[in-house]
């Protein structure tokens, strides 16, 4: 919880929510992209992508999922298992999974940390396109200055304290 202030997402003060409501909020409104992908190895790409939606007791929007897979360039891999994919394809599947529930916010923890520089640029471009296309806020954690400079806004944090915040080029 924040030391001061409030956090609003979709008009709701999320820290005024009770624990159960906050859990539901996280599941429905926040997509997570992990550095290590965290794909389930025995599930196909498609099954991994729709898993969070189905765990929420909902039916996946197949047309929307296909659109995401097309946008990320992995639709032809939807029946493959994660072990049959390159690192970049696995990261794209992880991004697709984060997008499938149509979250308001994507939290990306070093999404290019395990990728080569060419694949990293592809993934960053896809995140930007996805954020614009699906109207999402993307919060990305990175230690890479080049990647940070691609953001619209940069917040530098050290030891849990904000050192600086502002528009790209001004921080």
Enumerate the predicted regions with their spans.
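ABC family nucleotide-binding domain
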Residues: 1-157
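Conserved beta-strand-loop-alpha-helix hinge in the C-terminal portion
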Residues: 161-171
